[in-house]
Amino acid sequence: MTSLPLTPVNLDAPARRAAMPPRHLADLDLAGRQALVAELGEPRFRARQVSTHYFGRLVRDSGQMTDLPAAAREKLTDRLLPTLLTPVRELTCDDGATHKALWRLHDGSLVESVLMGYPDRVTACLSSQAGCGMACPFCATGQAGLTRNLSTAEIVDQAVYLAGVAASGAVAGSPPRLSRVVFMGMGEPLANYNRVVAAIRRLVAPAPEGLGLSQRHVTVSTVGLVPAIRRLASEDLSVTLALSLHAPDDGLRDELVPVNQRWKVSEVLETAWEYAARTGRRVSIEYAMIKDVNDQPWRADLLGRLLAGKLAHVNLIPLNPTPGSRWDASPKPVEREFVRRLRDAGVSTTVRDTRGREIDGACGQLAAAEGDEIVGPGAP
C-alpha cells in the first residue's frame, strides 16, 4: 500500500453557520409542543392530536389531519409541521427490499436515508449531518466535507417518512413496521451530539411523544470521538455503539480514519469497553474490507488479539467503492480468511449484507451523483 498524506481533522471547528430550519414538533418534547400550542391560542390537547398523527399514524401532511378544525390546522402547520425534507430522488433495488431517498433541505443541502427490509425486521439508516468533517479517504461523504449539522427534527423526519414506507407494505418480504434505526448515514453522529441524542429520545419515546422504538434497536456509529462516547455512556440510554475502526494499528488508522491522529486505537477501544461495561451493550466493531490495504492476515490476527474476551462483535463491510476511487473491496477468499482468523481468536464476526449497490447505496454516493448533475463534474 502506498502511504497517504495524513489528513488533519479540526474537531474544534463548528459546522458552517447555515440558517437552521424552522422549528418542528419533533424538535420539542410533548410538554414543549403543548406550550407552543397554548401560545397560538389553541387548547393544549391539540399538541397531542398532532403528535398522534405524526408519530402514531406517520402522517407528515397536515392536510390529512381532518379531525383538526381548518383554522387550527393552518396555524399548527406553520408552527409545528413545516416542510423539512423535500424529495429529490427515490430509488428501489434488491427486489424491493431496499429503498433509498435523497432529500433537499431548506438551504439546498442534500442528505440521504435508506430503508432496508429483512424477513424479521425493517431498518432505517439515517443521516445526522449534511456532509461529514471526518475526512475518511475511502468514504464519499467524508470526501465531500461538512456542510452543517442537521436539526433534531430533520433527523427524526427521515425516520417517520421511512416508517411510513414500511407501514405501506412497500418493503418486499418484510414486516410492515420500522423496528430498528442505525445512525450510519451521512455525517459523524457524535459530532452533532445534542441533536442526535434528542432525536434518539424522540425515536424511543412512546407515541404520541415519539416513535416508540426500543432503545436496544438503535445503533449509533462513530469514528471514535472519545469524550462524546463517554458522554453517551452517561445518558441512561441502552443504545448500541458501533465503532468504525477499519484498522487495528495506528499507522494505518491514522490514514484511513484521520481522527485517530488525536485518539489512538488503544484509547478508542478502552473507551468502547467502558461504554460496554456501563450499558451492558455489546460494541459493534465496523471494519471496511479494502483490498490490499487493511485485509492482511496479520491485521486480522492483531484485531483478534485486541478484541478477544471483550463484549464486542466484528461487522466486516465489503467496501462499496465510490466512482473514480482507487479503493476496491477485498476478494471473497481474502474476506473469508479474515473471518476465519477472527473466529479462531474467539471473536464473534459476521460480514454485512451488501445493499443498494445498484442505486449508489453507500453513504454519500447518491448525493454526490446528484451534486455532479446539478453543478457539473469537477465543480467546487
Swiss-Prot record:
UniProt keyword annotation of Iron present: yes
One example GO MF annotation: rRNA binding
Cofactor note: Binds 1 [4Fe-4S] cluster. The cluster is coordinated with 3 cysteines and an exchangeable S-adenosyl-L-methionine.
Gene3D superfamilies, A to Z: 1.10.150.530, Aldolase class I (3.20.20.70)
Domain of life: Bacteria
Chief place where the protein resides: cytoplasm
NCBIfam families registered for this protein in UniProt: rRNA_mod_RlmN (TIGR00048)
PANTHER family named in the record: 23S RRNA METHYLTRANSFERASE, RADICAL SAM CORE DOMAIN-CONTAINING PROTEIN
Purpose: Specifically methylates position 2 of adenine 2503 in 23S rRNA and position 2 of adenine 37 in tRNAs.
Any further remark recorded for this protein: Reaction proceeds by a ping-pong mechanism involving intermediate methylation of a conserved cysteine residue.
Family: Belongs to the radical SAM superfamily. RlmN family.
Name of the protein this chain belongs to: Probable dual-specificity RNA methyltransferase RlmN
Biological source species: Salinispora arenicola (strain CNS-205)
GN (gene name): rlmN
